[in-house]
């Protein structure tokens, strides 16, 4: 038995026991099973051969024939095939492993790019590993961990970008990181030193589109698969034969010299595998052995091609299995996962007051244990909402125009979706006065999205959907208009209600409809039928008296001796004066602040509640039925309808780098160079020559025509 050590991308190691005669596929399958990896064809096992070259473990060849001392070799689990667009990766685990590979390439200097681009990528890695920005923690972590060769001079930029990623989950950070990396010139490039026919030092590399020729980090030539007729090697010379109609004035065979025969053969095998994975529709078949002994190589690619992977994933056969990310527990637990909501921050104390006043709902955590106060004791420093609130408060000076508030968006995104409550807007012909004083229902919890997997799940993912049906607690900023026979021409002071349903107002009135609509009819309030002396009617009468005193005071200040609220037409100047008077009494403050006690309630794009709280929404149609027989002031009619609080997912940094067409994984159409790559059904053909091995790609006449297909995810 062989005890073989495999090192994974998170630097963890595991020893697998295989049979003495096992092939490389046995060890590779054990490694993928250890990770619960479904899209395994993108990866491979690399090791250092006896000649000092890094080579890939062949899956069809016995391990003992590839490695002299297997027990002393450490096999490295790495990304082997880099797709043109990481949006082709269906599984979150696959994207996470690609992110770890990008992280290693950054540390080794394999991905040269600008300082801003490098700092932005590292900031996404920090967001995935540490959570939201915290200056002290970030500074300490960057001092202990090396992400870049020149990290010291970029720490300021890294922390600046990390501060803009508040609220993003690790999965979202992985997608953004891969979207940046795929646009770099050296993405997925593994250069192999060589020299051309004139003795100039160059590097050869293979990618999804073909064979590349580089000088330093600059591509000086690209030979697409469609141009190549044959790839072969002879001793340490690597040969590229082109189609005759491609370069008429140049030689159809290009020769490059590599360091050794082993290095040349290893690069040739990599080219064979890349061509099969990206160009063939299915795995190439094995050739029957000939009677005569051949000295040529019989190497072929083993595994599913990219086309098969995409078709297999499109049919939904790939199973998403849970996995554990690499985090830094001491820092992560100390900060209580700052991506989770902070229910006790200064901004959200009003929501907590509502919960205490209107009964504790009943929630269920991830372990199935019910709790009435979920995560109410998690005080932290610099929570996600606090940082966002401070940023928005700074941007809101001077005061923002209330008419433009609905166009603003928060720079942070929270993983919550507040659904619209379902209201019954039908008028109730027989309102029951007891409903006004009925028992209030408990607050309904809401469905959260679990962005963190494994044991690093954030605190907020313990809240689940509501356990029992309950009525939504609705915030209604409705002016309390007395139910009298007179029309109110002046905007009364707004009285806010927190009730389980819209406030029900008795509909009795002795005035006939034609009398109310007549402009010359007037009925004294004393002529109305007296109501029952209930506490509610007493309060209504008191409010009417206070309102009349206030109206008379305003009339005296405006130069009018009498106010007829029922007969004469509404004076818009007087109404404006009244509204301005009330607004002047309100302290000046920014409209972006999330204060539920202001005269005009902030819109949903600025107020983002962070915990189990009632769905706060404007419902102009809720009280149109209650006051259907009265003319509401015009200022009420501009109230917006029910709003949906949906966390945005936007990035404010390096917008020229991030493009929206990447998210093919979530249903958006992808426009990428892959659409221009023509898939070929050609197979490999190996000729038998002494010390010579190569493969032929079919010519333009022999190439099997394949119907153009779009293998991008819908």
From Swiss-Prot:
Q: Which GO terms describe its cellular component?
A: cytoskeleton; cytosol; extracellular space; growth cone; neuron projection; neuronal cell body; nucleoplasm; plasma membrane
Question: What does the record say about tissue specificity?
Answer: Expressed in liver, kidney, pancreas and at low levels in brain and heart. Expressed in embryonic brain and developing neural retina.
- Coiled coil regions, renumbered to chain: 537-558
Give the protein's function. Plays a role in neurite development, may be through the activation of the GTPase RAC1. Plays a role in the control of eye movement and gaze stability.
Signal sequence extent: none
> Could you identify this protein by its name?
FERM domain-containing protein 7
UniProt superkingdom: Eukaryota
- Summarize the disease involvement recorded for this protein: Nystagmus 1, congenital, X-linked: A form of nystagmus, a condition defined as conjugated, spontaneous and involuntary ocular oscillations that appear at birth or during the first three months of life. Other associated features may include mildly decreased visual acuity, strabismus, astigmatism, and occasionally head nodding.
Cellular compartment(s): Cell projection, Neuron projection; Cell projection, Growth cone
Q: Which keywords label this protein?
A: Cell projection, Coiled coil, Disease variant, Neurogenesis
* Gene name linked to the record: FRMD7
One matching Pfam family is FERM_N
For the FERM domain, which residue ranges apply? 2-282
PANTHER family recorded for this chain?
FERM DOMAIN CONTAINING PROTEIN (PTHR45858), FERM DOMAIN-CONTAINING PROTEIN 7 (PTHR45858:SF1)
Q: Name one GO biological process term.
A: negative regulation of stress fiber assembly
């Amino acid at each position: 038995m062989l005890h073989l050590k495999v090192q994974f991308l998170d630097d963890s190691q595991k020893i697998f026991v295989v049979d003495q005669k096992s092939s490389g596929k046995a060890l590779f399958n054990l490694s993928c099973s250890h990770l619960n990896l479904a899209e395994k064809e993108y990866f491979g096992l690399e090791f250092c051969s006896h000649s000092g070259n890094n080579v890939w473990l062949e899956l069809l060849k016995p391990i003992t024939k590839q490695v002299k001392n297997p027990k002393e070799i450490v096999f490295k689990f790495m990304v082997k095939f880099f797709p043109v667009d990481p949006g082709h990766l269906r599984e979150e685990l696959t994207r996470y492993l690609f992110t770890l590979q990008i992280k290693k390439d950054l540390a080794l200097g394999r991905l040269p790019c600008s300082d801003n681009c490098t700092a932005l990528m590292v900031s996404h890695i920090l967001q995935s590993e540490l959570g939201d920005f915290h200056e002290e923690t970030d500074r300490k972590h960057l001092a202990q961990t090396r992400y870049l060769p020149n990290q010291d001079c970029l720490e300021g930029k890294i922390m600046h970008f990390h501060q803009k990623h508040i609220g993003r989950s690790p999965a979202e950070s992985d997608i953004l990181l891969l979207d940046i990396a795929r646009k770099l010139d050296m993405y997925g490039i593994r250069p192999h030193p060589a020299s051309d026919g004139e003795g100039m030092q160059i590097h050869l590399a293979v990618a999804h589109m073909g064979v590349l020729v580089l000088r330093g980090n600059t591509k000086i030539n690209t030979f697409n698969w469609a141009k190549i007729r044959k790839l072969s090697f002879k001793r340490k010379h690597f040969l590229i034969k082109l189609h005759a109609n491609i370069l008429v004035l140049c030689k159809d065979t290009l020769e490059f010299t590599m360091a050794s025969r082993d290095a040349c053969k290893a690069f040739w095998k990599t080219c064979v595998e890349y061509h099969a994975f990206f160009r063939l529709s299915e795995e190439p078949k094995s050739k029957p052995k000939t009677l005569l002994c051949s000295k040529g190589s019989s190497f072929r690619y083993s595994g599913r091609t990219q086309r098969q992977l995409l078709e297999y994933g499109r049919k939904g056969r790939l199973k998403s299995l849970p996995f554990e990310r690499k985090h830094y527990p001491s820092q992560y637990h100390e900060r209580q996962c700052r991506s989770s909501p902070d229910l006790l921050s200064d901004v959200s104390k009003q929501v907590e007051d509502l919960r205490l006043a209107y009964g504790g709902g009943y929630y269920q955590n991830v372990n199935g244990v019910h709790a009435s106060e979920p995560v109410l004791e998690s005080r932290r420093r610099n929570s996600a909402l606090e940082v966002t609130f401070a940023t928005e408060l700074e941007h809101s000076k001077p005061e923002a125009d209330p008419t433009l508030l609905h166009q603003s968006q928060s720079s942070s995104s929270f993983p919550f979706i507040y659904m619209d409550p379902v209201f019954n807007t039908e008028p109730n012909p027989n309102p029951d006065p007891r409903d006004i004083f009925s028992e209030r229902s408990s607050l309904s919890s809401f469905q959260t999205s679990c962005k963190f997997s494994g044991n690093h799940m954030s605190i907020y993912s313990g809240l689940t959907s509501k356990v029992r049906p309950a009525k939504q607690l609705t915030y209604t900023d409705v002016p309390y208009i007395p139910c009298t026979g007179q029309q109110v021409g002046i905007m009364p002071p707004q009285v806010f209600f927190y009730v389980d349903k819209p406030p029900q107002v008795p509909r009795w009135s002795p005035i006939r409809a034609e009398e109310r609509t007549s402009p010359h009819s007037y009925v004294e309030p004393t002529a109305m039928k007296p109501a029952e002396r209930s506490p509610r009617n007493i309060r209504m009468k008191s409010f009417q008296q206070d309102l009349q005193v206030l109206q008379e005071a305003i009339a005296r200040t405006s130069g009018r001796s009498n106010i007829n609220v029922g007969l004469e037409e509404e004076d818009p100047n007087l109404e404006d004066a009244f509204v301005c008077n009330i607004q002047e009494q309100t302290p000046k403050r920014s409209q972006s602040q999330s204060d539920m006690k202001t005269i005009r309630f902030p819109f949903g794009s600025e107020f983002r509640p962070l915990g189990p709280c009632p769905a706060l929404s404007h419902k102009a149609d809720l009280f149109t039925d209650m006051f259907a027989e009265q003319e509401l002031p015009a200022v009420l009619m501009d109230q917006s309808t029910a709003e949906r609080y949906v966390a945005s997912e936007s990035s404010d940094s390096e917008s020229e780098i991030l493009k929206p067409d990447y998210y093919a994984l979530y249903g958006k159409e992808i426009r990428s160079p892959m659409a221009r790559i023509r898939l070929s059904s050609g197979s490999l053909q190996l000729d038998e020559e002494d010390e010579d091995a190569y493969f032929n790609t079919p010519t333009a006449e022999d190439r099997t025509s394949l119907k153009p297909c779009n293998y991008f995810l819908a």
